[in-house]
Amino acid sequence: MNDVINSPSHYADAAVSITFEPVDLTERLPHPIASAVEYIIRAGRKNGCSEAVDLGKARWWLKRALIRFEFEDVKLDPLAARLLWHFAVYHRNTILLPLAERVDHSVITGDGIKITIARIETRLEKLEAE
C-alpha cells in the first residue's frame, strides 16, 4: 500500500529497494539544489506531473543555484555526500551523477551544476522528439 505521507511512490524506484527517502538528502542541501534534486528524483513519477515539467522545474532551480554557487563549491557533510551518491548511482540517475562526481564526493561544483543542466536539456529535447 502506498503511504502518500511518509513514503510517496513517486520518489521510489521499483528496481531498487530504497532505504533512504529523498528528504534525508534534501534537508542537508542548500535550498535551490535541494529543490532541483527533488524534481529530478521524482521526474515523471508523480501523478499529474510529466517528466518534462519536473525536469523543467529542476533546471530552473539549478540555474538559480548556479547564480549563487558558480564560483564556490557547495560543501557536503559526509551523510549528504553518501546519499547523493546513492540516488545518483544506485538508482541509475544519470542526470544527478554530475552533482556527485568529485572523487571524494564532498562538494558540488559549479561545473557539476552546469553539466547537470545540460543533461536535463538533453533529456527534455528527447522528450519533445517523442
Sequence positions of predicted segments:
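Intrinsically disordered, low-complexity regulatory regions
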Residues: 1-130
